[in-house]
């Protein structure tokens, strides 16, 4: 939209004041929009990474926690949970199995899948009696799951903790990438113990008169 029809002050919200920039209005276009700007979004690590990390959290039975160590290595981000499980975030090297790919590696090999539901393994034996396609997880499944949980009082698959901590993991990963070094995170206190430089990046100063 044209500058004349944009309430720029309201659009900026609590972010620091800056001159009108039409590129920042395309916040959900991560190729050219404001989603890559720290004041308006956390870039691809949060936008795409959270969709993959939540599956890794689920597989590790870690919906209510997050990795405790994060370190950039060779263009990737390596993280570690308290139980020793490692999480690696990377931009490339995936099989063409749809968006949001995940690979699970163990002492017997690896299994990889994506949004299209196809399973590919390092060894055919890993898929014996499991099938080669598990099907996607359509959005209406989440609706049905939520409504069922309203009745049963169980936790839905996509519960609040799953969303919260997968995003926390991605934010901590971003901080490690920004600093270019290893950081240690406490998922209970939600802080980087003894690391003021990392702790300062957990939030930004709010522009007056905004409060949170």
What are the residue ranges of the model-derived segments?
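Contiguous beta-strand/loop segments that form the cofactor/metal-binding neighborhood of enzyme cores
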Residues: 1-161, 165-212
């Amino acid at each position: 939209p044209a500058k004349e029809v944009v309430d720029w002050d309201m659009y900026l919200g609590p972010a620091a004041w800056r001159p009108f920039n039409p590129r920042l209005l395309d916040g959900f276009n991560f190729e050219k929009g404001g989603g890559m700007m720290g004041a308006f979004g956390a870039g691809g690590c949060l936008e795409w990474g959270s969709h993959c990390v939540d599956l890794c959290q689920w597989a590790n039975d870690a919906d209510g926690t997050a990795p405790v160590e994060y370190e950039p290595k060779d263009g990737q981000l390596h993280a570690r949970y308290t139980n020793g499980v490692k999480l690696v975030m990377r931009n490339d090297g995936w099989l063409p199995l749809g968006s949001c790919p995940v690979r699970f590696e163990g002492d017997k090999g690896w299994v990889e899948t994506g949004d299209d539901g196809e399973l590919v393994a390092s060894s055919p034996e890993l898929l014996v009696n499991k099938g080669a396609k598990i099907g996607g997880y359509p959005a209406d499944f989440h609706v049905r799951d939520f409504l069922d949980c309203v009745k049963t009082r169980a936790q839905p698959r996509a519960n609040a903790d799953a969303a919260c901590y997968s995003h926390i993991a991605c934010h901590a990963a971003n901080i490690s990438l920004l600093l270019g070094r290893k950081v240690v995170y406490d998922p209970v206190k939600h802080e980087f113990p003894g690391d003021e430089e990392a702790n300062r990046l957990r939030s930004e100063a709010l522009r007056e008169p905004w409060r949170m």
